[in-house]
Amino acid sequence: MKQVVLGTHETSRWPEFAGSTWVRLQYMLGLTKLGIECFWVDRLAAVDPLTHSHTLEYLVERFDRTARQFGFHDRYCIVYNDGEKHFGFSESSLKSLTESAHLLLNISGHLPPSSQLMRIPRRAYVDVDPGFTHIWATQVDMGLGRHNFFFTTGQNVGTPHFKIPLNGVNWQAILPPVALDHWPARIDGSCKRVGTVGDWRGSQHAVYEGEYYGGKRREYIELLHLPRIAECAIELALCIGPEDWEDIGLLKSSRWKVLDPFLYAGDPYSYREFVQTSRAEFSVAKSGYVKSNSGWISDRTACYLASGKPALVQSTGCEWKFPGQKGLITFRNLEEAIAALKAFDRDYDAHCRAARQLAEEHFNSQKVLASVLSHVGM
C-alpha cells in the first residue's frame, strides 16, 4: 500500500480553530478513501503553561479525540519541542515511516530542514495562502528548494493574471479537497443563517512594492453598511482579538450579528454543524488574496458548497473557473454584494442543488487528490 505523510505545524496547539483542522482532515480522509495509507505528523513547539491557555496534556487529548472520531488514532504523531517527546506513534515508528513513505505533503511548508520527514523522496509544498506565500518567497527563504513538487489553491498562480512573480517555481493549481462522505448535502429552505466563520485579521501580512496585503478587516469595513442597506441579517462567527474589540461594537451598530467562533464552531463537529445549518455563506476574502488576484477559493466555501449551501463570496479572480454557475456568486463591491444577497434567494433550491453539484464536480477529494498523486507519479 502506498504511504503518504501529511506534515503540519502547530495544528494541535489550537484545537478550537476547527476550520484549520478541517483543512488537514480533508487530506487525511480523502487519501484514505483512495486506498492510501495516510499518516499525520504535527510539529508542536514547547507549551508554556504560564502563557498558553491549554496544557500540553489537554492539547494531546483533544488531538487524539479527533483522530479517534475520524478513524486515524493509530496513524498520527505529535512531535513535541523538536523531538523531546512523541505522542501517538513512537519516534522509532516515525523513523521507519520516513524510510518507507512515498510522498510528503508539507502543508504551508512549515516543516524545517531538520525534520526527519524531509528525507522522504517526494516532497510537495502545499500552499494554502496564495499571494502571501509568493510575496514572502521574494523576500525570505521559504524552503521551496527543499521540495520537488508545488501545489497551490490559487487558481491564477502561474498565469498572467497573478500579480506576484514566481521566481521559476512551477506551481500546480488545485482546488481545496472536500471528503464528501463527511460533508453530505443538507438542503433545507427553513435555515436562516447567512454568514461565515473565520478570522477578523488573521496572521498573514505582507508588503510588496510598497503595498500592504493583509486580512479581512479592511474588506468588511468597506461593506460596513451592507446589512442595513440590503435589509439582511448577516452572522459572523469571527475570532476578533482584544486590540479590535471596538470593531465588534462597530459591526453590531451596523446590524451585523457577531458570534463567538469557539462557542459555535470550536471543534470539527460543531464547525460542520454551523455550516450545515446555515442558509448560505457570505464572506469577504483577505485583502492579500484579492489584491494579488490569486484566484484563491476558501476551503470553508468548499464545505458550504458540499453541504448544498450557496456561497456569496468576495472575488479573488476565480470566476473563470466556474463560468455561469449558480451556487457560487462573487462580488467586488458593496453594490455587487447587495445584488448577490438578493440573487440567491430568488431561486434558492436551484442554487442549493448547483452548490452541491459544484462540490461533486470540482472539490471532491477523490478527484482533487487523485490528480495530486498522478502529478507526483503515484
Model-derived regions: residue spans:
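Extreme N-terminal starter segment of soluble prokaryotic enzymes
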Residues: 1-4
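Extended catalytic core of nucleotide-activated donor transferases of GT-like folds
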Residues: 6-161, 265-270, 274, 290-292
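Catalytic binding pocket for nucleotide-activated donors in carbohydrate/polymer assembly enzymes
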Residues: 10, 14-15, 19-21, 25-26, ...
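Conserved catalytic-core segment of nucleotide-activated headgroup transferases in glycan assembly
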Residues: 23, 161-280, 288
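Structural alpha-beta junctions
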Residues: 28-37, 67-75, 145-149, 171-173, ...
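Hydrophobic anchor at the start of a short beta-strand
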Residues: 36-39, 123, 194, 234, ...
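Short loop/helix-cap segments at secondary-structure boundaries that form the rim of catalytic
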Residues: 113-119, 142-144, 160-165, 246-253, ...
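P-loop/Walker A phosphate-binding loop and immediately adjacent motor/lid segment at beta-alpha junctions
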Residues: 116-131, 166-184, 307-309
